[in-house]
C-alpha cells in the first residue's frame, strides 16, 4: 500500500519539513533554514535564491549582490539535475492545494466532462514576459507582490491573512474551472522551471514492452501531455513540463515507468508537447 504512495508521502514530508524549518527559524531563532522561498540561507551561510525572482529584480534595476547571484546559481544547478518543475511538486506549498483539487476532480468525474483543456499552457510564458516588463517600469519585482505562492508561504510562517483567500481561489479554480489550472497554465514560476527542466538529468522513462495500456499514469498525471509516448515507444519524458512528482511511477503496476538518468548521448528525439 505504502509503495503506491511512496513518492507522494516523500513529497509531503519534504514540503511540510521545509515549512517547519522556516517557522522555527522565524519563531524560535533556530536558523537551519531561514528566509522564504524567494531568498533563503542554510545555516546562516549558504545562500539560495529564486532565479525567476532575481530576473525580475534585474529588470527592475535592483543591485544584485554576489550572494544573491550565487544563491540563484545553486538553485539552477540543483533543478537542472533533479528536474526544474520538481520545485512545483516537491517544494511549493501550493502543490498540496492543487493536488487535492485534482484528486477531487477525478473522484467527481470532472475530468471526463472537461476532456479538452480550454486554455493554452503558453499563458504562463506570457505572464513571465509581462512580469519582466512591469518590473522594468515599476522598479520592483512585479510578480512577487501578487504571487499566491508567496501569500501562502508567508501565511504559513507569519499567520494567514490573504493566504487563506489565495488558497481558496486556487483550489476552486483548479477544482471547477480547469484541471491543473494554476500550476499548469498560469503560474509563471512553473513556466520558468519548465524551461529549466528541459536540461534536467533525472527523468521518468517509459518501457513500452512492459506497458499494458491501463492508462492509470495519464489519469493521475497533472501534466498528462508529457506522457505522449505511453503505449507507443520506449523513451524518457523529454518535456520540461514534467514535475517529476512520481505519481505515474507509483500507480504503474507493470513497471513500465521508472526514474532514470538522462542519456546525454541521445537527445535528438523530437519532443511532442
Locate each region found by the language model:
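Non-ligating segments of multi-cofactor redox enzymes
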Residues: 1-235, 240-243, 250-273
